[in-house]
Amino acid sequence: MKRGKRILEKLIIFYLVIRKGEKMLGQASGRSNICNASARAKARKASLIDPTRMRQLLQTGPESIGASIGELGYRNEMDIYSARMSGADAVEAALFHNLDNDLSDVMNFCQGPLKSIVAIYVERFAYEKAKTVLRAVNGGCSDELIESQILPSENPMNAVWLDIVRTTETLHEAANSMAGTPWGKELAKLDDSDATLEEMEDALDRQYYSHALKVSKGRDSNPQLVKYIRTEIDHRNIINQFRELRQNISTEKRLQMVIPGGRLSKTVMSQVSQANSNKSILEALRRSNTFDETGFDEAILESDALGTLDPIATLLNHRRHDLLRSFSYLNPVSVFPVIYYIERKVLEIQNLRLLVRGKTIGLTAEVLEAHMDF
C-alpha cells in the first residue's frame, strides 16, 4: 500500500512538472515569452537533419549507420546505451531518450500561458507512455523486458512508468495506479471490471483532445490553433473509422468511439459510422464541406491493393504537416514555430528509426525513402 502511494505521488509530480512548471518559469508575471521562444524554436529547427543529409544517410551501410546518427546530435544518448545494447535497439533507445530530453528543454524555455499551450504537444507523449504501460501489462510482458527494451531504465523519465509496471499484475491494476493524473481520472470513469485495453486507449484519446481544445482557446492562442487541433481530431476519427470497419466493429461501437470536437459534424460522423465499405465511408465524408477529398480515391485504391491503411494514414499525415507548416510561416511570432519545431523533431526521430530498422532487415534506400516524411 505504501509503495502504491509513492507511485501515485511520483505520477502526480510528473504531471505537475509538465503542466504547472510554468508557475516557476514566468506565469506569475502573466506574460508569455513568445518572441524569445519562437526564435529559439526556429534556431533548433534549423539544426535538424535536412532532407539532403537524410538522403545521404540512406546510402550509409548498416554497420556504420549508428555512428553516423551519433554525430548528428545524438552522441550523448548513444553513449548511454552502447554499453548494454547494440545495433538498432541501441539507436532506437537513444532516439527516444533524446526526444524526451529535447521536449523538456522546450518546456523550460517557454513561459506564461505559452507554456500551457506548448504543454498540449508535450503531454501527448505522456499519454502515449501511459498507453505503452497498459499494453505491456495487458500483454503479459515481463518486467525485465519492459525495463530493458520498451521503457529503458537508463532514461530517468521512464522511472515513474516502470514503477507501475513493477507493482501491478493486471490491466486494471495498472489503470488504477494512474489515479490522480488526467489520464488516470479518465480511466476511472470506465467500468473497472469490464473495460478493455481498447476502451482505455479510446478514453485516453478523448481526454487528451478535450483538454487540448480547452487550452487552445485560452490566452495567447489563436483560431488557427483551434482549427489545427480540430483537424487532427478529424484525421484521427477518419483513420479509426477505416480501421474499425476492417475489424468488423459494430456501427454502434464505431459511433461511440468517435472523438468529439472535430470539424466534421456529428451527423456526418454518424453516417460514416454506418458505412459498410471504404467507398461508402468516403461518400459519407464528402457530405461535409470541411472535408478535402483530394487524393482520397487514389489512397483508398492503394490501401485496398496493399491490404494496409498506410496510404490513407500517410495522406492525412502530409495534410496535417502542410497545414502546420503554413500556420508557422504565417504566424512567425506565435506558438506555431514552437509547435512546428516539435512536430519536425518527432518526424526526424521517426525517419531515423525507420532508417535504422530498415537497414537492419535489408530494405533498399528507395523503399526507405518512399516511406519517409521530410
Regions found by a protein language model. Name each.
Residues 16-374:
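N-terminal domain-start signal
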